[in-house]
């Protein structure tokens, strides 16, 4: 196969080091995929240039194998409207060569992402009634449209699509982490139940699309999360649902420019995106995708309208939502209670789906609408953090 730089009649060795793309680092101690990297091309990279670059990458695959790097090469390719890139296993010499391509914007290690759940215990649900009553109450008040005609992409650990809570409205979309179309942690099923379950859900008529990116330990590589976002955008576009879709990511990890950039593409495409702020009681600015300013980043509140002790905070937070002792669906049937910002984010996704159906707003305008409806009721929200609590605008 003819190499990319042979086609263009010059070689990598001839490139000036001043053109080298930045190789980003991750915080000390962060868990990463061994020799795993994410490569993001510059915004002005044409489809032709990207294709040629991939041809060149394929041509050096055998060289990496000969150097003893087993399983080397490109694993995932990303082709968003405004983001082109790929991820894979590469040795140090290859990464240096890649970074010297003037079309490459940056390279970063492929860090491990985790779900944002902290505890499980059995207690009665309260989140639905709280988000539909300004001053609290026992009943969930909502319009009968209930998210009808809206799709909810749950980018998580999988979903038990046969659970009675979903009434046949849940389907498998894509599995990007293993070959098991099941929810090994219960996390994704719980999240989906909060968004669209018949009993525990907010948008009770919305369709759930399971996009599995986390394994049975609740972990997955950043590259897989980006692939899940890419798949969701393409799937929604194919079905004409971009502006009638919500995408929830109750997960996070160390800061990733690539993940933030990919997440922003979903909003640019027309979708609503909710993400969890994190459970370390720190400023969420250092986490991804929570630090991406265009997404709806959700912190966790308690039954008494306080900040949950574990919840992250900071200027990246858009809203608080119920995230303590939340009852929802469990794989195999039945229910379970979980706490975490992982439980707060799907409340926002559910209300967004509800408002998209009820008011006809496009998905990428829903976060603004949520903030317009929200109430400034959270006590001690944290430094430089909003005090606004999610509300569905029921009038109660």
Curated annotation (Swiss-Prot):
Signal peptide per UniProt? 1-20
What is the annotated role of this protein in its UniProt record?
Secreted subtilisin-like serine protease with keratinolytic activity that contributes to pathogenicity.
Q: Which residues form the active site?
A: 156, 187, 342
Glycan attachment sites: 63, 230, 248, 392
The record places domain Inhibitor I9 at: 37-113
Q: Where is the Peptidase S8 domain?
A: 125-396
This protein's UniProt keywords: Glycoprotein, Hydrolase, Protease, Secreted, Serine protease, Signal, Virulence, Zymogen
Kindly list the places in or outside the cell where this protein is found, as annotated in its UniProt entry: Secreted
Start and end residues of each stretch annotated as Disordered: 376-396
Question: Which GO BP terms apply?
Answer: proteolysis
Q: Where is the composition biased (Polar residues)?
A: 376-389
Q: Which organism is it from?
A: Trichophyton verrucosum (Cattle ringworm fungus)
What is the name of this protein?
Subtilisin-like protease 5
User: Gene for this protein?
Assistant: SUB5
User: What Pfam families does its record include?
Assistant: Inhibitor_I9 (PF05922), Peptidase_S8 (PF00082)
Q: What is its EC number?
A: 3.4.21.-
Propeptide positions, renumbered to this chain?
A: 21-116
- Tell me which GO cellular component terms the UniProt record holds: extracellular region
Question: Which GO molecular-function terms appear in the entry?
Answer: serine-type endopeptidase activity
UniProt similarity note: Belongs to the peptidase S8 family.
């Amino acid at each position: 196969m003819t190499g990319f730089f042979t086609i263009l009649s010059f070689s990598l060795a001839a490139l000036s080091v001043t053109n080298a793309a930045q190789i980003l680092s991750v915080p000390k101690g962060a868990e990463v995929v061994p020799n795993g990297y994410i490569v993001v091309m510059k915004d002005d990279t044409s489809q032709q240039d990207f294709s040629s670059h991939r041809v060149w990458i394929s041509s050096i695959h055998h060289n990496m194998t000969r150097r003893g790097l087993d399983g080397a090469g490109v694993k995932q390719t990303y082709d968003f409207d405004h983001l082109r890139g790929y991820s894979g296993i590469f040795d140090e010499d290859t990464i240096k060569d890649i970074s010297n391509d003037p079309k490459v914007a940056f390279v970063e290690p492929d860090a491990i992402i985790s779900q944002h759940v902290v505890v499980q215990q059995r207690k009665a649900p309260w989140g639905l009634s709280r988000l539909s009553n300004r001053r609290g109450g026992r009943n969930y008040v909502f319009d009968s449209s209930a998210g009808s005609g809206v799709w909810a992409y749950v980018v998580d650990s999988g979903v038990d699509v046969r659970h009675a809570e979903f009434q046949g409205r849940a389907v498998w979309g894509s599995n990007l982490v293993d070959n098991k179309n099941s929810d090994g942690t219960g996390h994704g099923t719980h999240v989906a139940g909060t968004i669209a379950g018949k009993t525990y859900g907010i948008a009770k008529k919305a369709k759930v699309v399971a996009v599995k990116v986390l394994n049975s330990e609740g972990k997955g590589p950043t590259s897989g999360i980006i692939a899940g976002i890419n798949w969701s955008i393409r799937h929604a576009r194919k079905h004409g649902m971009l502006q009638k879709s919500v995408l929830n990511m109750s997960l996070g990890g160390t800061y990733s420019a690539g993940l933030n950039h990919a997440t922003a593409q979903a909003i640019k495409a027309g979708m609503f995106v909710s993400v969890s702020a994190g459970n370390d009681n720190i400023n969420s600015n250092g986490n991804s995708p929570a630090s991406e300013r265009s997404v709806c980043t959700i912190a966790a509140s308690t039954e008494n309208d306080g900040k949950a002790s574990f919840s992250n905070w900071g200027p990246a937070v858009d809203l608080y939502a119920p995230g303590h002792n939340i009852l929802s669906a469990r794989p195999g049937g039945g229910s379970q209670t979980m706490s975490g910002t992982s439980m707060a984010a799907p409340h926002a996704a559910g209300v967004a789906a509800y408002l998209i159906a009820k008011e006809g707003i496009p998905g990428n305008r829903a976060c603004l609408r949520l903030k317009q409806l929200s109430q400034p009721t959270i006590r001690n929200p944290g430094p430089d953090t909003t005090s606004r609590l999610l509300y569905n605008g029921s009038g109660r």
